[in-house]
Amino acid sequence: MKRHKICKIIFAILAVFLCVAFYELIGICITYKKQPAVSDATIKETQNIMSVAGRENTERAVIIEKNSQALLERVRLIQNAKDEIILSTFAFKSDESGKLILGALHDAADRGVHVRILVDGMESWIDMEGNPYFYGLSSHENVEIKLYNKANPLKPWKTMGRMHDKYLIADGKIYILGGRNTYNYFLGDFPGHKNFDRDVLVVCDEPQKDNSVNQLLDYFETIWEQEDCRYFHNSKKLADRQSVKKAVLELQEGYQQYFEVNKEKICDKDYADETEKITLLSNPIHTQAKEPVVWYQLGELMKNAKERVKIHTPYIICNDMMYNTWEEIAQKVPDFSIMTNSVANNGNPFGAADYAKNRNRILETGIDIWEYEGGYSYHGKSILIDDDLSVIGSFNMDMRSTYLDTELMLVIRSKEVNKQLEDGMMEYESVSRQVLDDGTYYDPYHVKPIELTEKHKRKVFLVQHLLGWARDLF
């Protein structure tokens, strides 16, 4: 009798789980399976993306390649801010680099600087809820933290709409934008796993209305006021908790130690190159399936190249529309290539599985594929066009970035910045091999490929056969 009762309870729990899973699946599929087309308004707007006209551009830019430099530059911006700091990030963890950023932000707030932080609501549920380090910051009188589209299992029709933006703005004059999240994988040089990525730092001493820094500020204000952005634990009473007091003290002491060691590097300096024009590209900010605005705009930029287009992306997950775009570019541009992680080097099982299955389809577009074999997963999202255009940001060459996430890409017209980007790209390409049409490799750099382990093979196999139907959601 007792055993029968236990079986009934287990069956009831399983039935509830399956009902919830079915509810979530139906809600997600109904909302996100239909992929919107490009509108006439986007087509018209795109025609003016990179026309160089009007007043002389006052913005300067420099690319940030190394993770250690990426942490230092963020601390430098925060430390030198006098009025306002804006931070938007997909993921924010309280590991070593995350605590340094938290400590720097807390120090700025103590100086009277107004701090606003926006974090994606799915990642924050994992990393920030119940975390005294974040409560110590959110309860500060000069700090506001909001979450974009907070995770809610009762609303599956909003589940897949995520905020993938990553940028930091100081005093409305200087900002960092790129593909790096706010934790050890991307910032600093701490032991353990790493992801290699790329940012660009932009400086504008006297911002004009049409400068990119104002484009980014306008974008932030719009998404900050969006109805799906809600405050994160802003009660001042949180500061009275012993666990929060202890966490704040740890942040303050840790940041002061880092500051003392790096004081000379953190002092304000000017080393950015002049630019002709910088333009911000952005996806819609709502949580539903999105018009592929950034994809279309990037495609038009690449189609207008005269000599070369070089893409770097961690993942390639395309539909027919995206493949067709690449086919058009390949027909128009003599030198068209892409570098991505090899199957063995890709830390994302969904990206690895889809690439393994569709590599030949990618080759059929006419694009040259280079596979990165550096050991740590490559996360950079950049495009090099001819000798004067550079595109850097958060956009992956996949359907999630195209149709589901908010995304930002910065288009910079500058031969000096273009050369910086080319040098950075080639450093990674020197650890890559070109895939040939027959499946063999051209290996001019004598690269030793990463071993595809049995464990990784099993992951790829399972994703391909169990989740391949949902490739547009990952």
Question: What is each stretch, according to the model?
Answer:
Residues 2-143, 153-164, 170-474:
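Charged, low-complexity intrinsically disordered terminal segments
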Residues 146:
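Phosphate-binding P-loop/Walker A region and its immediate neighborhood
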Residues 150:
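Short loop/turn segments at beta-alpha junctions that line or gate ligand-sensing/allosteric surfaces
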